Curated annotation (Swiss-Prot):
It holds the Pfam family Ribosomal_L35p. NCBIfam families: rpmI_bact. This is Large ribosomal subunit protein bL35. GO terms for molecular function: structural constituent of ribosome. The keyword Ribonucleoprotein applies. GO terms for cellular component: cytosolic large ribosomal subunit.
Amino acid sequence: MPKMKTKSGATKRFKKTATGFKHKQSFTSHILTKKSPKRKRQLRGTKLIAKSDVASIKRMTAC
């Protein structure tokens, strides 16, 4: 049986680290005027994927 192909969109969005997978926070690209400074500040940076989603991310990225 051939190797499973990776989902190219998933490989662009998720990065494997020693502690799990990190990803960019959503809701930060546009329509930012109605969001409070506190909300925008908390959405900054990268977050780790929840443990319940790790198996599906591994399948999509073929890690």
